[in-house]
């Protein structure tokens, strides 16, 4: 993005109005994308999935909680908190994560130094409001980057499980 927002607002919670406004802007932008996808005859808007990697995975606490047109979430190297101060309640992910109730697959590296497994990913997984049978956490003996073959296989299997195989 070339929006003039300092890089620190992209990754770290803080209690500023700027951080709050940026989070609201991200959600509005995401909703506009879905509005557009719904106008396309070549897109089945009943089968929209959220995929987030790293900071996009962290946004998986918020976007699937407030955008009900998303039916599945795949979170890669995401987690619940990366604090530098306490965010305003209206954008504190702890207030949203339990509202994520769609089937959710999380993939995470046990040795991720960017988004801690123990302090961010596991707490997010435990607090997601999705029924146990519809959420899955796979932990790899890696760092922030999941091996691509496993990532692709698990993601496609998850999409096929809930959306069915892609028609040919």
Identify the role of each PLM range.
Residues 113-120, 147:
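Conserved alpha/beta-hydrolase "acid-adjacent" motif
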Residues 94, 117-122, 153:
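Short, surface-exposed alpha-helical segments at coil->helix boundaries
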Residues 1-28, 84-86:
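Cap/lid segment of the alpha/beta-hydrolase catalytic domain
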Residues 74, 105-107, 138:
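Conserved hydrophobic packing residues within short motifs/helices of P-loop NTPase cores
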